[in-house]
Each structure stands twice: as C-alpha cells, then as structure tokens.
Design a protein with these regions (language model features):
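Electropositive, beta-rich accessory/interaction domains or terminal extensions
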Residues: 2, 6-110, 115-118, 149, ...
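Short, basic/aromatic beta-hairpin or loop at an interaction surface
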Residues: 76-86, 124-139
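Short alpha-helix capping/helix-loop boundary micro-motifs
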Residues: 89-91, 139-146
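A short, polar/proline- and glycine-enriched secondary-structure boundary/capping micro-motif
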Residues: 122-126, 168-169
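Short secondary-structure transition/capping segments
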Residues: 130-134, 159-164
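Extended, hydrophobic interaction surfaces within ordered domains
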Residues: 131, 146-149
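Short, well-structured beta-strand-loop connectors
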Residues: 150-155
Length: 186
C-alpha cells in the first residue's frame, strides 16, 4: 500500500503542469484564459498585462483543477480563471507546498510561494451564488524570482521545498490569513 501511494505521488508529480493561464485588465473580476498563446512573466512583477502584477507579494496566483471540480460539485458553473487565478494547475498538491517553496514553470520561470490563501474583505459573486468561495482557502500566491515565457501545458517542477517562511511577504499579511483560518472565516 505504501509503495502504491509512493508511485501515485510520483506519477502526479511527473504530470504536474499548467492547464490554463488567465489574465484580467482589472482586479476584482474573473480572469480570461489566454489559450495556447505564450505569456511573458516578468521578474518581481508577474504576468505581463495582468492587473495583479506589480511590486508586491501576490504577483501571481495558482488554483488546482481539483478545486474547480469541487466548486462544480457545489453546483457552480466555473472554469479556469473564474476565481481570478493566473495559473490553473493539475498534478500538484498546491496546499501541500509550504511558504518559500520554489516552483519552476516551463523552462525559465521561477516562482516562490509567498502566501497560502487570502482574506476576502468583500464577498465575490461566486460566494453569493454558492454561499462559499474556495479560493481564499485553496488558492496560493507567489513572487517571480526569474522571468520568462510560459504556455498552457508547460510543466511545473518543485525546485526547492520551502521551510514555511517567505521573506517577500509582509508579516501582517500572513498574520491576517492565519487569524482568519483559526477563526474559521476563510
């Protein structure tokens, strides 16, 4: 049984990839999948032409296809980008990645996980439709350490597993998420 679990984990890790890249011109809205078009990721900034790019600790965001499937199980008609994630993924357990984990996207892009989850100060349309929103609990964020070009279908590789800390993230941002998690409000 242990060997089966190991093989399954190995298979999933070897299949880890970006299934969709999504951008938006402004914050607070769903992002639009860009299809197969290669996208430029700028160092210490994020996805070119995306509203969330900038000099802060949440330059890019990730959400697993499994999270979208759970939302669909709740009766929502959602797809890639609908939770405003930049990268929709499969084959990698995003919630198992501690802060500081470094991910290689494609051949060149290097991202460090800077925040797990987020506090929603204003409830989004999805929350009002379903009474819940998965992204605050299941979305993760990163800062871009090395830029480059990525496309849907590119591999995701864990380059270095983090130790649970990230120097790019303000302590108050982490404290806010942790307080909400403990209070059960994420």
């Amino acid at each position: 049984l242990l060997l089966e679990r190991y093989l399954l984990a190995f298979e999933e890790a070897s299949m880890a990839c970006i299934t969709s890249i999504n951008i938006s011109a402004r914050k607070g809205v769903r992002k639009t999948p860009v299809g197969d078009a290669p996208q430029v990721v700028l160092v210490d900034d994020g996805l070119e032409n995306d509203a969330h790019a900038g000099k802060w600790h949440r330059q890019v965001s990730f959400l697993a296809e499994a999270s979208l499937a759970r939302a669909r199980d709740m009766g929502l008609e959602v797809g890639p980008g609908d939770f405003a994630e930049n990268f929709t993924t499969k084959g990698i357990d995003l919630l198992d990645l501690p802060l500081g984990t470094q991910l290689r996207l494609g051949k060149d892009v290097l991202v460090e996980i800077s925040q797990i989850g987020k506090v929603c100060h204003t409830r989004c349309a999805i929350y009002h439709l379903a009474g819940d929103c998965l992204f605050p609990r299941e979305g993760i964020f990163g800062v871009v350490l090395h830029g480059g070009v990525v496309s849907a279908g590119d591999a995701i590789e864990v380059v270095r597993r983090g130790d649970g800390t990230c120097t790019h993230t303000p302590p108050e941002a982490l404290a806010e998420v942790e307080a909400a998690r403990k209070a059960g409000t994420l």
